[in-house]
Every structure is written in structure tokens, then in C-alpha cells.
């Protein structure tokens, strides 16, 4: 099973996105996908959605990391699992940038998604319940793809 972590991004959103799409980490950006935004302008698109919704909380985005055991998944399978996780958790209602990093001993996904829902204008509620839902969906996708039941 993959390990998942999530934390808020309260500043330097552009730097966080630049880090996750770094070509040295993502096989020259082959392993980068976006939803309702473009990787170069995602930070401004996130802020535009936020402004349009009239939201002024401190959290700009959420950074979700999904790490796989060494050798457990190919970069392509890991990336596909990340896309499916986004679909299950974010339901096409949040802009996101997904990248799969292959530069470490283990493959891992970085998902940065807007804290503001494009449909409702409400902020993502990050709490134990939402984290357990992320974990549940990630574990389910790993099982569906015949990945290990061990954790990183």
C-alpha cells in the first residue's frame, strides 16, 4: 500500500508547483498531469478561482503525497493511480497538478490541488475524516492494481 500525507500550502504556491514539476524528478515532465489548469500558470489560476469565490482564508492549496514501496509500481502505474485518486477524492471539482517523481529510491506522487472548490466556492475541509477517505481510496486503488499490502 502507498503511504499518504497531506499538508496545507499557505505561501509560495508557485515555488511548490515548480518543485513538483521539475523535469529531473518527473522524467522530463512526461509524468505530469493537470486538471482545469496549466502547470506553468496553475498558481495564478488557483488564485483566480479563490478570488472569484470571495475566499480569503490562509490556505492557498493542499499538497498530497502518495509514496509507493521501492519496486512496487512502475512510474506509469503510479501516475495512473494518482490520477484515479484525484478523480475519486476531488471529483473534478478542484484544479490540480499531479506529478510522479522517480528521482528517489521509491516512486511517489505529488498532488497540489486548489483549496477552493471550483463548483461550490467552498474550501476543502482537511480533517481526520477527509484524510481517512484519502487513505481508503488510495489503499483501494493499490489493491485494484495488485500492489503490496505492506506500507512504506
Identify the meaning behind each predicted range.
Residues 1-152:
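N-terminal nicking endonuclease/strand-transfer module with a His-rich metal-binding environment
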Amino acid at each position: 500500500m502507498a503511504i499518504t500525507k497531506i499538508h496545507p500550502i499557505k505561501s509560495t504556491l508557485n515555488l511548490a508547483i515548480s518543485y513538483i514539476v521539475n523535469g529531473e524528478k518527473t522524467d522530463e515532465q512526461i509524468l505530469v498531469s493537470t486538471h482545469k489548469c496549466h502547470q506553468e500558470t496553475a498558481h495564478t489560476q488557483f488564485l483566480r478561482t479563490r478570488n472569484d469565490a470571495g475566499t480569503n482564508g490562509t490556505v492557498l492549496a493542499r499538497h498530497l503525497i502518495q509514496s509507493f514501496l521501492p519496486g512496487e509500481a512502475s512510474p506509469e502505474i503510479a501516475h495512473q493511480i494518482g490520477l484515479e485518486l484525484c478523480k475519486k477524492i476531488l471529483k473534478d471539482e478542484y484544479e490540480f497538478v499531479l506529478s510522479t517523481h522517480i528521482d528517489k529510491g521509491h516512486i511517489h506522487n505529488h498532488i497540489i490541488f486548489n483549496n477552493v472548490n471550483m463548483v461550490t466556492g467552498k474550501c476543502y475541509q482537511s480533517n481526520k475524516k477527509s484524510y481517512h477517505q484519502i487513505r481508503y481510496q488510495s489503499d483501494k486503488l493499490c489493491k485494484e492494481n495488485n500492489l503490496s499490502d505492506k506500507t512504506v
